[in-house]
Amino acid sequence: MGRTREAGCVAAGVVIGAGACYCVYRLAWGRDENEKIWDEDEESTDTSEIGVETVKGAKTSVGAGSGVKLQGDSKVKPEVNLGLEDCPGVKEKAHSGSHRGGGLEAKAKALFNTLKEQASAKAGKGARMGTITGNRTLAPSLPCPGGRGGGCHPTRSGSRAGGRASGKSKGKARSKSTRAPATTWPVRRGKFNFPYKIDDILSAPDLQKVLNILERTNDPFIQEVALVTLGNNAAYSFNQNAIRELGGVPIIAKLIKTKDPIIREKTYNALNNLSVNAENQGKIKTYISQVCDDTMVCRLDSAVQMAGLRLLTNMTVTNHYQHLLSYSFPDFFALLFLGNHFTKIQIMKLIINFTENPAMTRELVSCKVPSELISLFNKEWDREILLNILTLFENINDNIKNEGLASSRKEFSRSSLFFLFKESGVCVKKIKALANHNDLVVKVKVLKVLTKL
């Protein structure tokens, strides 16, 4: 702001000085007398310019222009020359005007116009000087992390427009760059006039309305609210039957194919509550393979994966539909090794359901498993994981004995579950090492398993 104001003062001073000179000429001297004065001025131009050049820049011209006094010829001459020091072509224009017949008046007008142009040029230069160091703007070519568009890397362009204005503009730019990154999935709207609360216990007509809304809408937010409402109502046995009789299972299950992980999670939760009912399991079995495939390929340890595992666990509590998932045994054991604490517990509950069905024993022990699975028999794991893995080993060992598979050991490869649990001997050593575990419950379970070997 200081440079712009200084340039404006210089321009104003030059214009005022030129106008004052012209007024002095018109009012104080006559035409003929001023012609003589101007001729004398032309003759002494060289000597006067030498004296004037020792004065510094525009500040001297401002002081001279604004401080004009009618004291004599010697005062007027340096004032005119000061205005001309940055524009050597002014004298030539004045001379050309006089030779054309305009006389001293034409010279003065030419001088006035030239000074005016010089002032405008100085003002423009000052404005440019004040705008070189400009605002910090967002570079559109550099993407902002997590954002959909624009950039967050500052570049210099534009005008400063003063200290306060530039401070405000910088503050706005910073506030834009600190916005939360846009999400991959559709943004959930905060308000929607849904006819019911998600925790309301609905009657059959109300459930029909919710199912109709879910069937007709493509809005992710409405789908989520409807699925949560149906899932909460499916926790009650009377509504489990009502939703099935209203044809709600296919309407809910069609959302398994959606790409939105939130919608898939809510879909699995609703189907999980419905699967507690045996008749509903007969409807859900159509989609169990699709649920299993999606659960195995989705992001590891995600909420969608946990919801899918819970649904598969409920569907395998009975022996009716376990054969539909036998092709996924290797994936289950791989997930048991790779998953986090909660995934390990949930997948072990699922596998234990298969071990309690003797008919599934051969397929189960013949599948390939990672050798690192033996690390689960380590005392560093907590009680729940140790109890589940010991139960898994106990059930498989009992089934091998009951089904007479011990004599068929040649049928199984060295990478199979049969070889890892029965033939390698490493598993038995690990279990014996747990006999001195600090947890009494784990110690009792270990002793029970060892007595059956």
UniProtKB/Swiss-Prot annotation:
Cytoplasmic-side stretches of the chain, per the record, are 30-453
Which stretches does the entry tag as region Disordered?
140-182
Membrane topology annotation: Single-pass membrane protein
Q: Which UniProt keywords apply?
A: Membrane, Mitochondrion, Mitochondrion outer membrane, Repeat, Signal-anchor, Transmembrane, Transmembrane helix
Q: Which domain of life is it from?
A: Eukaryota
Region Mitochondrion outer membrane (MOM)-targeting sequence: list its residue ranges. Answer: 1-6, 26-36
User: Which Pfam families does the annotation name?
Assistant: Arm_2
Kindly list the places in or outside the cell where this protein is found, as annotated in its UniProt entry: Mitochondrion; Mitochondrion outer membrane
* Family the UniProt entry places it in: Belongs to the eutherian X-chromosome-specific Armcx family.
Q: Its function?
A: Regulates mitochondrial transport during axon regeneration. Increases the proportion of motile mitochondria by recruiting stationary mitochondria into the motile pool. Enhances mitochondria movement and neurite growth in both adult axons and embryonic neurons. Promotes neuronal survival and axon regeneration after nerve injury. May link mitochondria to the Trak1-kinesin motor complex via its interaction with MIRO1.
Please report the name of this protein according to its UniProt entry: Armadillo repeat-containing X-linked protein 1
- The species is Pongo abelii
